[in-house]
Amino acid sequence: MKTKLFLIACVAVMMTACSQKQSAVSVPVSQINVETLLDSIDYDMDVSGLQLSDVRLLRNAPAAQKGFPFKDAYIRGVYGTTTWYDSLVWKFAEKANFENIKMKDDEPWRDYYYRASKEIGLINFTEQEQAFIDRLQAREDELKKANFEAGEGLRVNMQNLVNPTQLKEFDSLLCEHLAKDGFAIVPAQHDQLFHIYEQNDYNQFPNFVTTDLFLQLYHLYVDCLLREVEEQKLLQLMIDFSKDMYHAMNRWENWSGEDEVLRQTAFHNAVFFDVAYQLFTGQYIGSEEQNAAAKPEVEKVMKSEDNFSEFMQDYHDVKFGYSLFRPRGHYTRSEALKRYFRGMMWLQSIPFGTRHMDEVREAVLIACAAKYEDQAMKNYDQLNRLITLLMGQPDNLSLLQVIDEVKKSNLQLNDLINDEKELTRIKEALDEIGNKQTRIRPAFEKTSHNKICILPQRYQPDAEVLQTMVDNDNKPTKRDVPKGLDFFAAMGVASAEQILKAEKNEWKGFDNALEQMKERMTQIDWQETTCTQWMQTLKVLTDKEGKQQMPYFMVTPEWDKKDLNAVLASWAELKHDAILYAKQPAGAECGGGSDVPEPVVKGYVEPNSGFWKKAIELLDNTEKVLKQENMLTERLSEITQRIREEAQFLLAISDKELAGKEITDEEYDQIKVIGATFENISLDLVRGKDQYLMGWSDVQGADKKVALVADVYTANSDNNPNKSILFEAVGNADEIYVVVEIDGCLYLTRGAVLSYREFTQPLGEQRLTDEEWQQQLEKNARKGVPEWMKPLFVPLNKLPEANEEYFYSSGC
């Protein structure tokens, strides 16, 4: 078996060499045959022509002859391909009698094993062997000085890789990209980022832990905490609120007597809450007459196609956006969430337009009644506070603002409803507030300038940028759809602005609009909500705190684009999670144990300490909001702590890497198993109540894949002949290969990155769900990849394969 493995290994090396023939750069091809090193080592050999990886192997040959179980996973893996090494390791283990060697306090078993082995003389060398080892160590130290002595236009010396056979076949195109940029992204179709790290663990492939991995986990955390809170608490709050407010309106209808104005107003409002209750529960609550009036609205909501409305005065002759009622995001995951989505969308988006006195009157009646509905308003306030802290302030006028204005009136409700002068005062006061407050407005308004909503959707600064960065002046428009890059350029991310300005743009107003938005973004309180803190965390990722200490590959324009890909993908996840609450802009209306220690696989964490600090702060603030609103369950609290510990660990490693401090073997072990760690946390997040998931293969539905989609802008301006919907999305996970320097040696590492996507589809088509997006990716895996990212990709005919003949783990 060992002979067969050795022959396979030789073939792999020959294939690697063949793949390099046409390349100006290549990885080192071994000139030594480790199989022959058991009996014959030429201690006087000339080593001046050997590559660094061979020098390291030869330096360890005397120890291999003694069966020493190397701590270095790569060296142990290479010698493990011989017919003789493993049997010698077992003999070494049999001699390892440490009964008289006491373990020190807090000493890891691996450290104890190697210390004890040395103390009982298991790894002593002859003078000739030691001289050979010392000579090779000196040569190794000399070669390391050339780690970054590469040819013109290259950043790293690929000949100095110390783990060149980590891949079964090292594609020349991948090698060229690595030499040029220090990293390369290989398009892949992994369901989850942590799958790549788990495969690395199995293959003893050094991990490169990306910020993407944490960003994906944070998205899942927010997404799942919202689901839990919405299904277990908020849905019932809104069912009760709608029911109580319906009964209040029904009472006023019954009490109206001969006051026809009051009766019609109360009837309309009763229908409003009848619809809400039906959407939340699937059942009508009203009278036969009320249900008959509610049914057409419910049908339009369920059909989710833009249409006219007899119920809303603004939309008799203008189509209302019923398409927005289609459950998307995580709201497709259960029937309860679908009902919650539709019901909340009704309360958030059905307007009482201030240019229609009848609708002002309706809003005033709801406000008057709400003052006496203590439990209903407690439910309202509980949800409103939480959503405000998580998502932002209302953009349209809210029920609370109408209540404030009603309180200023000394009239009884019956008199107020019929007092045109007082209603006009309230209308004008609300208009004054709305003119200052509402920032997300269509450029081509055809309905009331100010709208009152019971629970308005929330202002988020990215929406203001998107609506501003389109051409509403020229006919036809010269920029009909904004880009995700617009938002980050407005936030001051230089690389985003550079990409935008390098693109062909016929709209002369672009620069002025961008400068306007850059100024506006300086006025935002980024600490105000969880969503704005998330956005600011993404900005910090691009800032690169301590840039002068960062590794060579992170201070390049190419890595800036890698960062942009990560922040845009995470932003797409944010929009996915906030799709119900954020107001959308529009143009117009395991293995066995062992007697010897497991080897150490050295890994690397993307050392962006500024990001890791901000990520911990973001997590802490999210937990604080949940605690403040009594929404933090014991399960969420435990998961939050686990995620925090991972972020704190990644920050600590980043700080060590930047400071050049030694990373312990135990820390490398933790990096090695980070894929399994993140999978376990993710499983805890997505599992249902009382559900047990053995592994990710047990996860069902859209949650199984990282791919998701969110519609963020409706391009339906009057001057736009090609009306469409803009989608921000994440595709399946890609692989990233990075050449990093650890303890003076260049290692090939592998990690996972998010895949940002952006695309449009015609306005008349249904807004996409995650399930439909994932189906589209099965037919067109690279749909929506932006042009500016394509130079970073290495489009290989097949994914690089880890060299399992050399490297595999016996652990879980």
Q: Residue locations for each model-derived region?
A:
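Positively charged n-region of N-terminal signal peptides that target proteins for export
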Residues: 1-5
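C-terminal motif of bacterial Sec signal peptides marking the signal peptidase cleavage site
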Residues: 14-17
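Surface-exposed, polar/charged faces of alpha-helical domains
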Residues: 49-53, 120-127, 131, 142, ...
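Bacterial signal peptide processing site
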Residues: 19-21
